From Swiss-Prot:
Involved in the catabolism of short chain fatty acids (SCFA) via the tricarboxylic acid (TCA)(acetyl degradation route) and via the 2-methylcitrate cycle I (propionate degradation route). Catalyzes the dehydration of 2-methylcitrate (2-MC) to yield the cis isomer of 2-methyl-aconitate. Could also catalyze the dehydration of citrate and the hydration of cis-aconitate. Induction: By propionate, but not by glucose. This is 2-methylcitrate dehydratase. It catalyses: (2S,3S)-2-methylcitrate = 2-methyl-cis-aconitate + H2O; citrate = D-threo-isocitrate.
Length: 505
């Protein structure tokens, strides 16, 4: 289907310039959010897939420390008519439920992605919108509408504005998307959505140090924080509060001081009035628990190991890939931590040399076993790991940024040099699970991912109840969206780490 997208020029303006509110980027996004277009059936189906996907990775992360911390914080904020915290009974303040559920969905780096000018994980919009829907008794159809908008705005901003070039974390696109999505879901007026978007962006701009060097657990908290901030921004705007404006284009705004500066013009595509919002269909989930740009290399490594045979005969491996892959998870980052056997899990899942080495040795990837400290410290793994490097290839960079989804690629070409001098070469453009891959994810694969990761965590009866609720999401009446919560076996939660008390109790 050909989409009618309007390309908006976005640049900095001086305060003295004649720049009416209706030309502000936040206003144009609010127009899209307030446009009551119908949701295409395949788009609604994909929303359900991504809700299942988030539940899968949330179940797998339930007893990890960051998730346990966030859950404890949320449980300190019970309310009578609130939202659900993943895994447990009770009713809690929507902002804190979104916080806990956002950390659970993001902790394992295992849900959906969209890559273009910048990076994004648009399923990070799901926890805050579901939490607000649960607290306010929103019906399933309106939740779907809101999520479709959130995905659209998040992906369109990611297409048009590069944040990482200026060392700004990609959650700066998430905050406005959450605000816009909630605005659609609650059918708020355009002015209210405009101010909510401005506040959300203003408060979710932070540096990329969260994904550089020794990466900490904040990587999982960052999108949850943006979601929480987005909820609070909408709440204030609904009560009549305004926002810094123009937030992107102002003389002291985001573009002028945090991004490319007053001389640069960004071009952001947005749906034309009356145009269905379909951007979610351009995003893709993960089969492997690791940074998305390592998905195709993992599949490539699993394929290559049979051709190589004795891995001890490897002298070197060079992965030719895109600029983004090279500098974010490859040796172009200059991060020595990416070669440290004692590095955190968060650091290792952003180390393509480590990931490729383990996938090559094991022929598979596991969200826990592949990151185990004893796995990372294996002497043969460390030896192989240090033989792997990345280089930027202009052709892979071009394909990474290609506007044609059929030609867009996030893979690599591997050149494996053996001690004998023989060179083995293979390449893979997209991951097997990608829509254009050899085993693309459809509903069946999303359900299989959920049942696999929920095994031993969620009782089978509860798994089936949850899946049935998701299947009927579009028909859920007001108050029934609480059924999207998944209850976890209490014996599993008993295995969670003991967390020292904080301020919230």
């Amino acid at each position: 289907m050909v989409r009618i997208m309007l390309m908006h020029a976005v640049r900095a303006w001086r305060s003295a310039d004649d720049f009416p509110c209706t030309e502000h980027m936040a206003y144009k996004i609010a127009q899209v959010a307030a446009d009551p277009v119908d949701v295409d059936p395949e788009v609604a189906d994909m929303v359900c897939n991504r809700i299942i996907d988030n539940a899968a990775v949330s179940a797998a992360s339930m007893v990890r420390r960051p998730v346990t911390v966030a859950r404890h914080q949320a449980l300190a904020h019970p309310v009578r008519h609130g939202a659900k915290v993943f895994g447990v009974e009770g009713s809690y303040s929507a902002d804190w439920a979104a916080w806990a559920n956002g950390v659970a969905a993001r902790e394992l780096d295992f849900h959906d992605t969209f890559l273009a000018a910048d990076y994004s994980h648009p399923a990070d919009n799901i926890p805050p919108l579901v939490a607000v829907a649960q607290q306010l008794g929103v019906c399933g159809a309106e939740l779907i509408r809101g999520l479709v908008t959130a995905y659209e705005i998040h992906i369109d901003l990611t297409r048009g504005i590069c944040l990482h070039e200026h060392k700004i974390d990609h959650v700066a696109h998430l905050g406005p998307a959450v605000a816009a999505g909630i605005g659609t879901m609650l059918r708020l007026d355009q002015e209210t959505i405009y101010h909510a978007i401005g506040q959300a962006l203003h408060l979710t701009t932070s540096t990329r140090q969260s994904r550089k060097g020794a990466i900490s657990s904040w990587k999982a908290f960052a999108p949850a924080h943006a979601g929480k901030v987005g909820i609070e921004a909408v709440d204030r705007a609904m009560r009549g509060e305004g926002s810094p404006a123009p937030i992107w284009e102002g003389e002291d705004g985001v573009i002028a001081w945090l991004l490319a500066g007053p001389e640069h013009t960004y071009r952001v595509p947005l749906p034309a009035p009356g145009e269905p919002k379909r951007a979610i269909l351009d995003s893709y989930t993960k089969q492997h628990s690791a940074e998305y740009q390592s998905q195709a290399p993992i599949d490539l490594a699993c394929r290559l190991r049979e051709r190589i045979g004795d891995l001890d005969q490897i002298a070197s491996i060079v992965l030719h890939t895109s600029h983004h892959t090279h500098v974010v998870i490859g040796t172009g980052s200059g991060d020595p931590q990416k070669f440290d056997p004692d590095a955190s899990r968060e650091t290792l899942d952003h180390s393509l040399p480590y990931i490729f080495a383990v996938a090559l040795q094991d022929g598979c990837w596991h969200h826990e076993r592949s990151y185990a400290p004893e796995r990372a410290r294996r002497s043969d793994t460390v030896a192989l790991w240090h033989k792997i490097s990345t280089v930027e290839d202009p052709e892979w960079t071009r394909r990474y940024h290609c506007a044609d989804p059929a030609k867009k690629a996030f893979g690599a070409r591997a050149e494996v040099t053996l001690h004998s001098g023989e060179v083995i070469v293979d390449e893979l453009a997209v991951a097997d699970a990608h829509p254009l891959g050899t085993r693309p994810f459809e509903r069946k694969q999303y359900v299989e991912k959920f049942t696999e990761l929920a095994d031993g965590v969620v009782e089978p009866v509860e798994q089936q109840r949850f899946l049935a609720v998701v299947e009927s999401l579009a028909d859920l009446e007001s108050g029934a969206v609480g059924g999207l919560n998944v209850l976890v076996d209490p014996r599993v939660l008993d295995k969670a780490p003991v967390i020292p008390p904080g301020i919230f109790r």
